[in-house]
Design a protein with these regions (language model features):
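Localized chelating/binding microdomains
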Residues: 1-4, 55, 95-98
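Residue-level recognition of specific faces of alpha-helices
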Residues: 3, 22, 47, 85, ...
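Glycine- and acidic-residue-biased ligand/ion/polar-headgroup-sensing regions
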Residues: 3-12, 28-29
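Residues that scaffold the ATP/ADP-binding catalytic core of kinase and kinase-like folds
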Residues: 12, 34-35, 66-67, 108, ...
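Short alpha-helix-to-loop micro-motif enriched in aromatics/charged/Gly
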Residues: 17-20
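Cyclic-nucleotide recognition modules
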Residues: 22-79
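Alpha-helical bundle regulatory/interaction domains
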Residues: 63-64, 74, 78, 83-89, ...
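Phosphate-/nucleic-acid-contacting segments
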Residues: 99-146
Length: 146
């Protein structure tokens, strides 16, 4: 796991056709990891990339296990963090299934305001599951107040 001290990162995967699919952006104050790989030791199916200069605090699995044993409040903190991650994942899945492109973009701008100027537009489009052209149209409509 890594704690983002400075910078912004993305977690993504690449499908068989070579298309990237972004699952998460993580900026200052966020934790980033492939939790499944981290906890099971299996190879990750995700890539994590810094989108700008970044400073991270890395926590190895063995250090994580030691901290969990030694400091009960640390275990409580991570339990809450993982619960919140599960809730966010469920909300994102529901959003991808039920919301329009405009609704997804508006929620993105409210949930991740720090990303708007720091993340390339094609990556934001990938995250919300729309084409670059659709995102451009949404941004234009929003800028003229429609």
């Amino acid at each position: 796991q890594a704690f983002v001290v400075k910078g912004i990162l993305r977690t993504y995967t690449v499908d068989e056709k070579g298309s990237e699919h972004i699952l998460q952006f993580a900026s200052e104050g966020w934790w980033v990891a492939d939790l499944s790989s981290y906890l099971t030791g299996e190879p990750s199916v995700f890539n994590i990339e810094a989108l700008e200069d970044a400073e991270l605090l890395l926590l190895s699995k063995s250090s994580w296990d030691e901290l969990m044993q030694a400091i009960p409040k640390f275990e409580h903190y991570f339990r809450i963090l993982i619960q919140n991650h599960l809730i966010a994942t469920q909300k994102r899945l529901l959003q991808s299934l039920t919301e329009t492109a405009e609704e997804k973009y508006l929620k993105f701008t409210k949930s991740y305001p720090e990303c708007i100027q720091r993340v390339p537009q094609h990556m934001i489009a990938s995250y919300i599951g729309v084409s670059r052209e659709t995102l451009s149209r949404l941004r234009k409509l929003r800028s003229i107040g429609k």
